[in-house]
Amino acid sequence: MHFIPEKLDDYVVMHSEEEPELLKQLTRETHQKILQPRMLSGHYQGRVLSMISKLVNPKNILEIGTYTGYSALCLAEGMQKSGELHTIDINEELYDFQRKYFDKSIYGNQIHLRT
Protein backbone atom coordinates (compact mmCIF):
# COMPACT_ATOMS: atom_id res chain seq x y z
CA MET A 1 0.00 0.00 0.00
CA HIS A 2 1.44 3.37 -1.05
CA PHE A 3 0.70 6.51 0.94
CA ILE A 4 2.45 8.76 -1.56
CA PRO A 5 2.45 8.52 -5.36
CA GLU A 6 4.82 5.84 -6.64
CA LYS A 7 6.76 8.34 -8.80
CA LEU A 8 7.45 10.48 -5.75
CA ASP A 9 8.52 7.42 -3.77
CA ASP A 10 10.89 6.42 -6.59
CA TYR A 11 12.38 9.93 -6.59
CA VAL A 12 12.97 9.80 -2.84
CA VAL A 13 14.67 6.40 -3.16
CA MET A 14 16.96 7.63 -5.95
CA HIS A 15 18.02 10.77 -4.07
CA SER A 16 18.32 9.50 -0.51
CA GLU A 17 21.40 8.51 1.42
CA GLU A 18 21.89 4.77 1.92
CA GLU A 19 20.48 3.40 5.17
CA PRO A 20 23.32 2.40 7.55
CA GLU A 21 23.71 -1.37 8.03
CA LEU A 22 22.98 -1.23 11.77
CA LEU A 23 19.65 0.48 11.08
CA LYS A 24 18.81 -2.14 8.45
CA GLN A 25 19.41 -4.84 11.08
CA LEU A 26 17.29 -2.96 13.62
CA THR A 27 14.45 -2.62 11.09
CA ARG A 28 14.60 -6.31 10.21
CA GLU A 29 14.58 -7.44 13.85
CA THR A 30 11.82 -4.98 14.77
CA HIS A 31 9.60 -6.47 12.05
CA GLN A 32 10.42 -10.02 13.16
CA LYS A 33 10.04 -9.67 16.92
CA ILE A 34 8.18 -6.52 18.00
CA LEU A 35 4.47 -5.73 17.93
CA GLN A 36 3.34 -2.83 15.74
CA PRO A 37 6.51 -2.52 13.62
CA ARG A 38 4.86 0.30 11.64
CA MET A 39 5.73 2.58 14.56
CA LEU A 40 9.37 2.43 13.46
CA SER A 41 10.60 5.75 12.04
CA GLY A 42 12.10 4.07 9.01
CA HIS A 43 14.68 4.86 6.38
CA TYR A 44 13.48 8.17 4.93
CA GLN A 45 12.31 9.75 8.18
CA GLY A 46 15.54 8.56 9.75
CA ARG A 47 17.68 10.20 7.08
CA VAL A 48 15.77 13.47 7.56
CA LEU A 49 16.33 13.30 11.34
CA SER A 50 20.01 12.58 10.74
CA MET A 51 20.33 15.51 8.32
CA ILE A 52 18.65 17.94 10.74
CA SER A 53 20.85 16.74 13.58
CA LYS A 54 23.98 17.17 11.46
CA LEU A 55 22.90 20.71 10.55
CA VAL A 56 22.19 21.70 14.17
CA ASN A 57 25.08 19.68 15.69
CA PRO A 58 23.45 19.53 19.14
CA LYS A 59 25.29 18.92 22.39
CA ASN A 60 22.18 17.53 24.10
CA ILE A 61 19.13 15.79 22.66
CA LEU A 62 15.94 14.77 24.46
CA GLU A 63 13.76 12.22 22.69
CA ILE A 64 10.38 11.30 24.12
CA GLY A 65 9.22 7.94 22.79
CA THR A 66 12.04 5.55 21.93
CA TYR A 67 10.17 2.54 20.51
CA THR A 68 13.05 0.32 19.28
CA GLY A 69 15.62 3.13 19.07
CA TYR A 70 15.77 3.83 15.33
CA SER A 71 15.17 7.57 15.55
CA ALA A 72 17.53 7.94 18.52
CA LEU A 73 20.34 6.39 16.49
CA CYS A 74 19.56 8.71 13.58
CA LEU A 75 19.58 11.80 15.81
CA ALA A 76 22.86 10.69 17.42
CA GLU A 77 24.60 10.85 14.03
CA GLY A 78 24.79 14.64 14.18
CA MET A 79 25.47 15.00 17.89
CA GLN A 80 28.67 16.64 19.11
CA LYS A 81 31.42 14.19 20.15
CA SER A 82 30.90 15.17 23.79
CA GLY A 83 27.11 15.26 23.43
CA GLU A 84 24.45 13.17 25.11
CA LEU A 85 21.11 11.87 23.93
CA HIS A 86 18.48 11.16 26.58
CA THR A 87 15.59 9.05 25.37
CA ILE A 88 12.50 8.18 27.40
CA ASP A 89 10.01 5.40 26.73
CA ILE A 90 7.06 4.04 28.67
CA ASN A 91 7.52 0.42 27.53
CA GLU A 92 10.13 -1.16 29.79
CA GLU A 93 9.81 -4.47 27.90
CA LEU A 94 11.79 -2.96 25.00
CA TYR A 95 14.73 -1.84 27.17
CA ASP A 96 17.05 -4.77 26.34
CA PHE A 97 16.23 -4.54 22.64
CA GLN A 98 16.93 -0.78 22.58
CA ARG A 99 20.10 -1.06 24.65
CA LYS A 100 21.46 -3.83 22.39
CA TYR A 101 21.31 -1.60 19.32
CA PHE A 102 22.56 1.48 21.13
CA ASP A 103 25.57 -0.49 22.36
CA LYS A 104 26.27 -1.85 18.86
CA SER A 105 26.55 1.73 17.62
CA ILE A 106 29.44 4.12 18.15
CA TYR A 107 27.06 6.25 20.26
CA GLY A 108 26.33 3.62 22.92
CA ASN A 109 28.05 5.54 25.73
CA GLN A 110 26.31 8.77 24.76
CA ILE A 111 22.75 7.42 24.67
CA HIS A 112 20.97 7.32 28.02
CA LEU A 113 17.74 5.36 28.12
CA ARG A 114 15.01 5.84 30.72
CA THR A 115 11.74 3.97 31.12
Segment roles from a protein language model:
Residues 1-20:
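N-terminal auxiliary segments of SAM/dcSAM-dependent transferases
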Residues 17-18, 34-47:
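Conserved SAM-binding loop and adjacent beta-strand
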Residues 17-20, 35, 58, 84:
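Alpha-helix boundary/capping and short turn/kink residues
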Residues 26:
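Beta-strand-loop-alpha "switch" segments that mediate conformational coupling across diverse proteins
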Residues 43-115:
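S-adenosylmethionine/decaboxylated-SAM
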